[in-house]
Amino acid sequence: MKKKILIVTRNLPPLIGGMERLNWHIADELSKTNKVELLSHSDARNQAPKNCYFNSIPLNPLYIFLILAFIKTFWICLTKRPDILFAGSGLTAPIVVFWAKIFRKKSIVYVHGLDIATNHELYKIIWLPMIRAADCVIANSTPTRDICLKKGISAQKLSIICPGVTYPPLPKNYDFIQLLQEKYQLHDKKILLSVGRLTQRKGLNEFVDLALPNIVKNIPNILLVVIGDTPSHSLNKNLQSKELILATAAKHHITGNILFVGNISDDHILSSWYYLADLHVFPVKHIPNDPEGFGMVAIEAAAHGTPTIAFATGGIVDAVSNAITGKLILMNDYQSFSKTVIFTLENPEVLNKENCQESAKKFSWENVKTRLNLLIQELNN
């Protein structure tokens, strides 16, 4: 029997990021077997999953979004009578849990890392108690679950459902890949790929400062391709910028080894870059109150047969299978990071394409849908 599910989230495309892609896919997958109402910001309407009933409110300012989400959730509960209320992140948890209690429905909160780890006083007073009161809390990784336990969330309420990936990936478009190679003069390059928003946590500036110079010294034809930009709507204001990173590169005389291509929302273009890359680099910094919740880009890279070199911090330890889909490096050990990149580029057989893709298969969105539906079924029994 189909369930009526209301998903309340601020994180949807065209905003760019892993949380946005995850929430879109959760809504899309659940709508295949349930009746899904989606409450989010107005800009998301045109890109929302086609089987969802979309309800819109303004994205900014944040307090207006939260107030209107609170009011509109009440109205949807009153008129549509959903069986389950689902918060797409900790941000909307108080709204979802409050109205679920009032209407005697079930509540689910999906947490990503920062939205449970933050030590903001208001968050500790209002948000954490409401997350604890949810009927079910889904963590995106083992480290995020561990943070939940430390924050007092009952182990009986906790489940881990990692973000998914489109598998099999889009087929290789050889003509478009050739166009990219010609446009950016890539034919004789070894390509390192970085995909993600330019924040302090992603650590790209530190990578350029402390690891890339040694890589360039040993492999002069290396090119670091950066997909992503400084986020404009992020609640996390610890940011980096293209200008900062290029200034750091200039200090080492390696600006010619970096290519910024900006944000890419077209999956076909992004897929081609994954196929083009020799390695995906993920030099995320360990910041105690700002953890990397999972690392969807590592799974996306693996699905295309591209291995990842990453620091072993946060949920990355769930996203990268060490010695299978990549190599995990001790946090902040930039010397080992650069040596591992050099060794892997010179010995590509140590991390082969087939192992990467086989490992990525278990993260398919189909598997995510199955696990979500099982959880919903258990919640209603």
Model-derived regions: residue spans:
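N-terminal strand-loop element at the rim of the active site
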Residues: T9-G17, R21-I67, P143-I147
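Nucleotide-activated donor-binding/catalytic signature segment of Leloir-type glycosyltransferases, i.e.
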Residues: G228, K237-I264, H268
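Conserved donor-binding/catalytic core segment of Leloir-type glycosyltransferases
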Residues: L6-V8, Q185-K202, V208-L212, V225-I227
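Short His-centered aromatic/hydrophobic patch
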Residues: A87-A93
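Donor nucleotide-sugar binding/catalytic pocket of nucleotide-sugar-dependent glycosyltransferases
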Residues: R132-I177, L186
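Short hydrophobic beta-strand element within catalytic cores of glycosyltransferases
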Residues: A298, A303, P307-A310
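Acidic donor-binding loop of glycosyltransferase active sites
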Residues: N257, N263, Y275-D290, T306
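Conserved acidic donor-binding segment of nucleotide-sugar-dependent glycosyltransferases
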Residues: N322-Q335, F343-E349
